[in-house]
Amino acid sequence: MKKYFVLLLAVLLVGGLFAVKITMTSGGVGKELEVLKKQLEMFHQQYPDIEVEIIPMPDSSTERHDLYVTYFAAGETDPDVLMLDVIWPAEFAPFLED
Protein backbone atom coordinates (compact mmCIF):
# COMPACT_ATOMS: atom_id res chain seq x y z
CA MET A 1 0.00 0.00 0.00
CA LYS A 2 2.83 2.34 0.88
CA LYS A 3 4.50 1.99 -2.53
CA TYR A 4 1.21 2.83 -4.29
CA PHE A 5 0.89 5.98 -2.19
CA VAL A 6 4.48 6.96 -3.03
CA LEU A 7 3.84 6.31 -6.73
CA LEU A 8 0.65 8.39 -6.65
CA LEU A 9 2.44 11.21 -4.85
CA ALA A 10 5.28 11.12 -7.40
CA VAL A 11 2.81 11.28 -10.30
CA LEU A 12 1.00 14.22 -8.75
CA LEU A 13 4.22 16.10 -8.07
CA VAL A 14 5.64 15.52 -11.54
CA GLY A 15 2.31 16.30 -13.17
CA GLY A 16 2.24 19.66 -11.44
CA LEU A 17 5.62 20.63 -12.86
CA PHE A 18 4.41 20.95 -16.43
CA ALA A 19 2.52 23.97 -17.65
CA VAL A 20 -0.33 23.49 -20.09
CA LYS A 21 -1.31 25.85 -22.89
CA ILE A 22 -4.87 25.90 -24.22
CA THR A 23 -6.06 27.90 -27.20
CA MET A 24 -9.64 29.05 -27.52
CA THR A 25 -11.64 31.21 -29.88
CA SER A 26 -13.68 34.23 -28.96
CA GLY A 27 -15.50 36.91 -30.82
CA GLY A 28 -15.70 40.51 -29.82
CA VAL A 29 -19.42 41.22 -29.98
CA GLY A 30 -20.36 43.71 -27.28
CA LYS A 31 -18.39 43.01 -24.11
CA GLU A 32 -17.85 39.34 -24.97
CA LEU A 33 -14.04 39.53 -25.15
CA GLU A 34 -13.76 41.84 -22.14
CA VAL A 35 -15.86 39.49 -19.98
CA LEU A 36 -13.90 36.45 -21.17
CA LYS A 37 -10.58 38.10 -20.27
CA LYS A 38 -11.85 38.82 -16.73
CA GLN A 39 -13.04 35.23 -16.38
CA LEU A 40 -9.66 33.96 -17.57
CA GLU A 41 -7.88 36.13 -14.99
CA MET A 42 -9.90 34.44 -12.24
CA PHE A 43 -9.28 31.03 -13.83
CA HIS A 44 -5.53 31.69 -13.98
CA GLN A 45 -5.46 32.59 -10.26
CA GLN A 46 -6.96 29.21 -9.47
CA TYR A 47 -4.95 27.27 -12.10
CA PRO A 48 -1.66 29.14 -12.62
CA ASP A 49 -0.08 26.31 -14.63
CA ILE A 50 -2.73 26.52 -17.33
CA GLU A 51 -2.17 29.26 -19.88
CA VAL A 52 -5.12 30.16 -22.09
CA GLU A 53 -4.45 31.93 -25.36
CA ILE A 54 -7.43 33.65 -26.98
CA ILE A 55 -7.66 33.46 -30.76
CA PRO A 56 -9.78 36.44 -31.86
CA MET A 57 -12.55 35.56 -34.27
CA PRO A 58 -14.66 37.74 -36.56
CA ASP A 59 -17.87 39.15 -35.12
CA SER A 60 -19.86 37.85 -38.08
CA SER A 61 -21.08 34.28 -37.52
CA THR A 62 -20.78 33.62 -41.26
CA GLU A 63 -17.12 34.66 -41.21
CA ARG A 64 -16.51 32.55 -38.08
CA HIS A 65 -18.11 29.55 -39.76
CA ASP A 66 -15.96 29.99 -42.87
CA LEU A 67 -12.82 30.29 -40.74
CA TYR A 68 -13.64 27.05 -38.91
CA VAL A 69 -14.23 25.33 -42.26
CA THR A 70 -10.77 26.52 -43.34
CA TYR A 71 -9.16 25.33 -40.06
CA PHE A 72 -10.72 21.88 -40.31
CA ALA A 73 -9.97 21.49 -44.03
CA ALA A 74 -6.31 22.27 -43.29
CA GLY A 75 -6.21 19.68 -40.51
CA GLU A 76 -5.50 22.26 -37.79
CA THR A 77 -5.42 20.95 -34.23
CA ASP A 78 -5.83 24.41 -32.69
CA PRO A 79 -7.91 25.86 -31.21
CA ASP A 80 -8.61 23.52 -28.31
CA VAL A 81 -11.85 25.25 -27.27
CA LEU A 82 -14.26 26.56 -29.87
CA MET A 83 -17.09 29.05 -29.64
CA LEU A 84 -19.70 27.58 -31.96
CA ASP A 85 -23.10 28.69 -33.14
CA VAL A 86 -25.85 26.42 -31.87
CA ILE A 87 -26.43 24.92 -35.33
CA TRP A 88 -22.78 24.05 -36.14
CA PRO A 89 -21.96 21.08 -33.86
CA ALA A 90 -23.52 18.49 -36.17
CA GLU A 91 -21.59 19.86 -39.14
CA PHE A 92 -18.24 20.01 -37.33
CA ALA A 93 -18.60 16.89 -35.14
CA PRO A 94 -16.48 14.65 -37.41
CA PHE A 95 -13.58 17.10 -37.04
CA LEU A 96 -13.92 17.40 -33.27
CA GLU A 97 -13.82 13.72 -32.36
CA ASP A 98 -10.56 12.31 -31.04
Curated annotation (Swiss-Prot):
Query: Which superkingdom?
Result: Bacteria
The protein, known as: Uncharacterized protein in bglA 3'region
